Amino acid sequence: METESTGTPTGETRLALVRRARRIDRILAETYPYAVAELDFETPFELLVATVLSAQTTDVRVNAATPALFARFPDAHAMAAATEPELQELVRSTGFYRNKASAILRLSQELVGRHDGEVPARLEDLVALPGVGRKTAFVVLGNAFGQPGITVDTHFGRLARRLGFTDETDPGKGRARRGRPVPPARDWTMLSHRLIFHGRRVCHARRPACGRCPIARWCPSYAAGETDPERARALLAYELKPGREELLELLRAGRTAGAAGPRPRAGGXAPGLPAQPFR
């Protein structure tokens, strides 16, 4: 619980929390240099639609469905003229396809009617769109426009609590907590990617692989899961999504996501987005 004297959930001083968070981010950046947006996209519109489709499913399933979807309806103008049955068939594999087809149709129509078919680059405009909440808006702002934003999904929220960055269980309240965020705003997007990636691979909800965690030394929740290194190894569940191996090789060679250049349906980092951990 956050205290009046320290202002942090762990009871450590604010300065100690900031230093620990910086160390954690540096280690995660070194461990996962390829942690970027997992949804494939080429335009802000594609990312917006893909993020809406990602609800209650995996990014892998969305990435399998979107090439055909965007080949037929490449922008808001084209999708706004689609019928719901057409969209339902194309997004069926993502689950809840009737609701999702309706959502992306209304979203496209609103973009055409209010923004001339362009995705707005302001938070207040994004959240005013049908089916777009703050999480989706921050994904788009951070990855399509290079504007800082923390993507609070289930992985990020779980890790933020385990690491003692917050004690809130409600993501909406977590944004409004007293005091300034631990990382500076410019680093929010990349920190989100790293924590989400770490949550998928190591820090699982039910049984985290503590014995294989690169930040175990700085985690106040160490021993919440399996601490034996060999047994923890068997729990590691995530490495790279299919098709990202070439990016890993480039990054290991010292090149950034931007240096890799565009590739078909690539998410990657937005132009100008910092690839280094905050300091």
UniProtKB/Swiss-Prot annotation:
Entry's Gene Ontology molecular function annotations: 4 iron, 4 sulfur cluster binding; DNA binding; DNA N-glycosylase activity; DNA-(apurinic or apyrimidinic site) endonuclease activity; endonuclease activity; metal ion binding
Segments of this protein annotated with the region Disordered: 256-279
Residue stretches making up the HhH domain: 123-142
GO BP, one annotated term: base-excision repair, AP site formation
PROSITE patterns on file: ENDONUCLEASE_III_1 (PS00764), ENDONUCLEASE_III_2 (PS01155)
Co-factor: note: Binds 1 [4Fe-4S] cluster.
Source taxon at top rank: Bacteria
Binding site for [4Fe-4S] cluster: C203, C210, C213, C219
CDD domains: ENDO3c
Keywords from the named record: 4Fe-4S, DNA damage, DNA repair, Endonuclease, Glycosidase, Hydrolase, Iron, Iron-sulfur, Metal-binding, Nuclease, RNA suppression of termination
Cofactor dependency: [4Fe-4S] cluster
PANTHER family hit by this protein: A/G-SPECIFIC ADENINE GLYCOSYLASE/ENDONUCLEASE III, ENDONUCLEASE III
Comment field (misc): Readthrough of the terminator UAG occurs between codons for Gly-268 and Ala-270. Two forms of 31 kDa and 32 kDa have been detected.
Protein family membership: Belongs to the Nth/MutY family.
Stated role: DNA repair enzyme that has both DNA N-glycosylase activity and AP-lyase activity. Initiates repair at cis-syn pyrimidine dimers. Proceeds via an imino enzyme:DNA intermediate.
Stated name of the protein: Ultraviolet N-glycosylase/AP lyase
Gene: pdg
